[in-house]
Amino acid sequence: SEQNWKKVRTADGVIGYVKNKTLKNEEKKNITRKFEEQDYSNISKDYTINMAWHNVTNQDANNAVAQRIAQTKGLTTLAPTWIHVADTNGNISSIASADYVSYAHKQNVEVWMTVRDFDGGISSEQESYELLSYTSRRETLITQLIAEALRVGVDGINVDFEKISDKCGEHYIEFIRELSVKCRQNGLVLSVDNYVPKSFNTQYDRKEQGIVADYVVIMGYDEYYAGSPEAGPVSSYNYVKEGITETLKEVPAEKVISGIPFFTRLWKETPKTEEELKSDKGTDAEQYSTTVESDAYGMDNAQAIVKQAGVDTTWDKKAGQNYATWEADGSKYEIWMEDSKSIEAKLKLMKKYKLAGTAEWSLGQESSDIWNLIQKYVN
């Protein structure tokens, strides 16, 4: 019976049972835990961050770095989209280039390589969960990320994971903690990209990110996104403001970077046919009387489209953007512009809330006048 046995543990952690009558020399001891609080000391730059994501899709695109930097002013940091998570075991695929980094360094620009859980390699919530819910897989991923960072000589790692489900939240933040420790040991800056805070993305745990990461970046765009059932601005003034004020409830201002778009969307709305209306009955789509398509355009292309349509823009005070609409081929077109006026309003928010800096998606989509403006606010 149980009374005849005692549960014991050896000094090296093996647990089992022994018979009471075999136990001799009993004594009581207080065991102290040798637990050391993890050090999450942070790297903080002594200048306003002006980071541009560089959407690099293949090895050859790295050669454009000289041309891209030459167009900018006041740029402090480049975040090339070099790294994809190749599989759920934590292997990475990389198009990182040491030449790119050394060129950027000669121009006094830091490089924080971006790693993503979409757009090549894994690209679903289930796969991100499969990856992050295993300690061993997180370890593989972190080891490969650090090795690649050291191989090409980057200054930091930028994490852009956008496929984190509710159940994955605890594993994701553990990954950020573990990566943070390794970045610290190797002198690498860790920045983490985040959605504008909403009730449905609390699993990203911005509060904990604000402790363990060096910088927390808000992606202040995709308010209305590709596949959105209705047309609207990509990045209205209030959306950016809400992103900042909500993030500041959990993260100190000196760690917050406000991400803004260099792109916009042209929306095409077409009335649904009788057949489409019928097939949408009883679904979420029923509330919309039009089908909506959109394409993303950089600033200059957006201006050209409006000019070609022969219409004028009007200032949409609520959105804080210039707006245009017109009809053609039985469809209605709408566009909320990103231009110097809308960008300046967003940069003023960065200043007002004394944030660490700004970030832009993405390099090459801006009009040439934008950099003079940005330089005014980051210096």
Regions found by a protein language model. Name each.
Residues 1-3:
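Conserved beta-strand/loop element in small beta-rich adapter and peptidoglycan-binding domains
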Residues 9-43, 48:
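Boundary regions of SH3-family modules and the immediately adjacent low-complexity/disordered segments
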Residues 31-36, 120-122, 127, 264-346, ...:
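Glycan-binding loop/region signatures in secreted carbohydrate-active enzymes
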Residues 61-86, 144-157, 346-357:
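Catalytic domains of carbohydrate-active enzymes, especially glycoside hydrolases
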Residues 76-83, 98-136, 143-156, 178-189:
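Substrate-binding cleft and catalytic face of glycoside hydrolase catalytic domains
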Residues 78, 159, 179, 216, ...:
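Conserved, mostly hydrophobic/aromatic
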Residues 88-95, 143, 166-302:
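Substrate-binding surface in catalytic domains of secreted glycosidases
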Residues 342-379:
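Acidic/aromatic/glycine-rich contiguous surface patches that form carbohydrate-binding/processing clefts
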